[in-house]
Each structure stands twice: as structure tokens, then as C-alpha cells.
Amino acid sequence: MSQILAMLPDSLVAKWNVVVSVAALFNTVQSFLTPKLTKRVYSNTNEVNGLQGRTFGIWTLLSAIVRFYCAYHITNPDVYFLCQCTYYLACFHFLSEWLLFRTTNLGPGLLSPIVVSTVSIWFMAKEKASILGIAA
């Protein structure tokens, strides 16, 4: 495990993406095992079922894979862009479920993904020029 971490580029954005990816893996596993934590996000728990939970789990796993890959290939502009897109999509999803579809209420289950995605969007935009050598 330490050898894998040693191969990580010397970038706080890369390290952040690894942390977020590991957290997403936990979320993926729990999505397949039980809808309990997913129900903490959405206010209409009748809409949260096994199928929805597993679909959410696959979406979360895909995001984790992209972010983990980005952590190790942080200087590749295409990979960096795709990683940024995962955070924009997550932010859009949770904000639209809250503000547009009204399927969730403002609370810890919603705040966590909104804060993580927003901070990640800001952090990646802020560091983009220094990591890629291009304008944000």
C-alpha cells in the first residue's frame, strides 16, 4: 500500500482525489449492501430502493475510478478535465435534487456531497494553472 501511495504525484489535488475516491468506495459498498445511508440523503425515502441504491453505487464507483486515475495522472489535461466533470455532475445532481426536484432536505446527508464537490471544483480550478501550466 505504501508503494502505491509513494507513486502519487506531489500535489495536494492528487492527494485530495485519493481521499475522495476512498470515501466514495465506502459509499459504493454501502449502496450495494443497504439503502440506509442513501435514505439519509433523500427526504422521500419511498423513492430509495435497492435498484436506485445500486444505480447510485455504480455512479459513485465510476466517479471514484475517474478521480483515483486522475490522482495518478494529474498532469494529463484530458484526465484533469474529466475529473473536474465528476465534481460538477455531483454538485449539479445534489443541488437539483434539493432545489429543483425537492427530493432532499438540507442536512448532513446532503451537505457532505455538496461541500465536497464544491470544494473540489474550487480547488481544482485554483490549482489547474500550476498543475497543467494552462489557465483555469
UniProtKB/Swiss-Prot annotation:
Family membership: Belongs to the ERG28 family.
Protein name as it appears in the record: Ergosterol biosynthetic protein 28
Gene (name only): erg28
Subunit structure of this chain's protein: Heterotetramer of erg25, erg26, erg27 and erg28. Erg28 acts as a scaffold to tether erg27 and other 4,4-demethylation-related enzymes, forming a demethylation enzyme complex, in the endoplasmic reticulum.
Function in brief: Part of the third module of ergosterol biosynthesis pathway that includes by the late steps of the pathway. The third module or late pathway involves the ergosterol synthesis itself through consecutive reactions that mainly occur in the endoplasmic reticulum (ER) membrane. Firstly, the squalene synthase erg9 catalyzes the condensation of 2 farnesyl pyrophosphate moieties to form squalene, which is the precursor of all steroids.
Other comments on record: In Aspergillus, the biosynthesis pathway of the sterol precursors leading to the prevalent sterol ergosterol differs from yeast. The ringsystem of lanosterol in S.cerevisiae is firstly demethylised in three enzymatic steps leading to the intermediate zymosterol and secondly a methyl group is added to zymosterol by the sterol 24-C-methyltransferase to form fecosterol. In Aspergillus, lanosterol is firstly transmethylated by the sterol 24-C-methyltransferase leading to the intermediate eburicol and secondly demethylated in three steps to form fecosterol.
Origin species: Schizosaccharomyces pombe (strain 972 / ATCC 24843) (Fission yeast)
Superkingdom of the source species: Eukaryota
Chief location: endoplasmic reticulum
One term under GO cellular component: endoplasmic reticulum membrane
Signal peptide: none
Pathway membership, UniProt: Steroid metabolism; ergosterol biosynthesis
Keywords: Endoplasmic reticulum, Lipid biosynthesis, Lipid metabolism, Membrane, Steroid biosynthesis, Steroid metabolism, Sterol biosynthesis, Sterol metabolism, Transmembrane, Transmembrane helix
Location(s), subcellular: Endoplasmic reticulum membrane
GO molecular function: protein-macromolecule adaptor activity; protein-membrane adaptor activity
